Amino acid sequence: MCKYAKMSLFVLLIVGATFFAYYNHVAFGPHFSLSKTNFKRLPYWEYDDQSQALLAFQKSCVDILKREPSAAFSTLPQSKSNQAWQTICLAANKLSHSDKMTAQQFFESWFEPYTVQDNFNPHGLFTGYYLPLLHASLKKSKQYTVPVYGLPADLVKVNLSLFGSDFSNKIIIGQLKNNTLVPYPDRTAINSGTLGKNANVLVWADNAVDVFFAQIQGSVTVQLPDHQSLLLGYASTNGRAYTAIGKVLIQNKVIAKENISMQTIRAWLQGHPEQVNDILNQNASYVFFTVLHTQDPLGMEQVPLTAQRSLAVDTHYIPLGVPVWLKTKIPEQRPVERLLPYHRLLIAQDTGGAIKGIIRGDIYWGAGEDAAFAAGHMKQIGRYWLLLPK
């Protein structure tokens, strides 16, 4: 989704984010270590139905098959060349309607697992994100007054890596004024109408809080009054620094840190409508959207995400397209609120502003109330193993 997730919901509400371009340039160094293991040592490997993971991997293959065959897949020594992955993808694409056993045999035949460690520590933080629902209209009215903007015509992105290796993975965003690149307007200015005709309004929403949370997620399903729907995806940010409103509310001592979640923040904002604009404007960062013509939101590979099979990672360490065996715990709301063990094969398909670190992941939960609950409450320690070509 290229969310703030992307873009961890929990962490973004409390900490913040920075945006980077996607490259499979992995910072393989003294703190990042990989050690080969075997599938028998992956906890509960044999119990997962990996047919859904195979479908997600086939989506990543759409991107992988477009890459230059002779180039390295990433700077990870064990990841081999694009050609090696393309051979695997061609084999994967021959498998249609695969069952659990066939999918498991596929991954075991083509890959071998590697334990990931950060300075000899295999554990890290795992969170979640989801696809929210936004009630909106194509026309402005008394009910629908909050604009959801498309990409402004005057927004300029500069890829600094084109100017030298010192600026690798750095992008700045602004606008030209008198032949000088200056920062793009912040959230306060945008909400005051400064964009004018530079940005099209894609839809008009009925709730500023819902628009704000849609920006955090990076994609949103729009429910129109005639019951038709649109899928909006991330187009760009305004380039301004991100300030987490959860952190603001904690500092203002209106919500205790241990109680912070998407749900508690939303409830507080709904209970204090007179303070909504002031709180939201504390975050200068603003997200612009584009209309997607796909059934599911797109990840950084520009392929559709799969609920509970797509993982946002830090591409400084984990290349996109890599299968990842994850062990952690997840929140469940029904029948009672509790934590459940979670062992599942996912595919690294997305990135996020809050997803930073060697062992760090953000599970895409899909849409609906249960997905919203999981994404809003998930903040668990876990570990993962990379599946790399034999």
Could you say what each language-model-derived stretch is?
Residues 25-35:
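Ser/Thr/Pro/Gly-rich low-complexity linker/stalk segments immediately outside membranes or between
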Residues 8-22:
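Hydrophobic membrane-insertion alpha-helices, especially the h-region
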Residues 14-17, 149, 333:
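Compositionally biased, intrinsically disordered low-complexity segments
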Residues 1-6:
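Positively charged n-region of N-terminal signal peptides that target proteins for export
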Residues 33-292, 301-303:
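Secretory/export targeting leaders with adjacent low-complexity proregions
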Residues 20-21, 47, 62, 66-67, ...:
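Targeting-peptide/extracellular-domain and disordered-appendage signature
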Residues 35, 46-49, 293-390:
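C-terminal soluble interaction/assembly domains
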